[in-house]
């Protein structure tokens, strides 16, 4: 087994571990909206890691381009998500999802 396949294997194990931790964070803690946002960002990090690993394995630059666009979208998503959380906190004085029901008038 050469060194490139070992590094790809380790990278994929790391990426899978990140993805499983983020899914566990979403499943275990559904009440805190900030932890949900962080878990979603961790999931996007796992996907970015996969893109970089496979792009490096096939010597393609497009993987890096995809990662750049995913990071830009993730930054915009985080900014909008945090702005919504701050607005909800200012109005309701809580970020606990079980106490928030914005569909009721």
UniProtKB/Swiss-Prot annotation:
What is the recorded membrane topology of this protein?
Answer: Multi-pass membrane protein
Q: Which Gene3D superfamilies match?
A: 1.10.287.3510
What GO MF annotations does this protein's record show?
A: NADH:ubiquinone reductase (non-electrogenic) activity; quinone binding
Location relative to the cell: Cell inner membrane
The EC number(s) given in the record are 7.1.1.-
Q: Does the keyword Cell inner membrane apply?
A: yes
Name the Gene Ontology biological process terms. ATP synthesis coupled electron transport
InterPro entries in alphabetical order: NADH_UbQ_OxRdtase_chain4L/K (IPR001133), NUOK/Mnh_C1-like (IPR039428)
Q: Does the keyword Cell membrane apply?
A: yes
What does the similarity note say?
Belongs to the complex I subunit 4L family.
- PANTHER family in alphabetical order: NADH-UBIQUINONE OXIDOREDUCTASE CHAIN 4L (PTHR11434:SF16), NADH-UBIQUINONE OXIDOREDUCTASE SUBUNIT ND4L (PTHR11434)
Name the chain's protein.
NADH-quinone oxidoreductase subunit K
Which species?
A: Francisella tularensis subsp. holarctica (strain LVS)
């Amino acid at each position: 087994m050469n060194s490139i396949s070992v590094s790809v294997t380790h990278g994929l194990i790391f990426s899978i571990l990140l993805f499983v931790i983020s899914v566990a964070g979403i499943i275990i803690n559904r009440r805190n909206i900030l932890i949900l946002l962080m878990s979603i960002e961790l999931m996007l990090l796992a996907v970015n890691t996969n893109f970089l690993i496979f792009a490096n394995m096939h010597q393609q630059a497009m993987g890096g381009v995809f990662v750049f666009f995913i990071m830009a979208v993730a930054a915009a998503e985080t900014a909008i998500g945090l702005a919504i959380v701050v607005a909800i906190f200012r109005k309701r004085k809580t970020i606990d999802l079980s106490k928030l029901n914005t569909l009721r008038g």
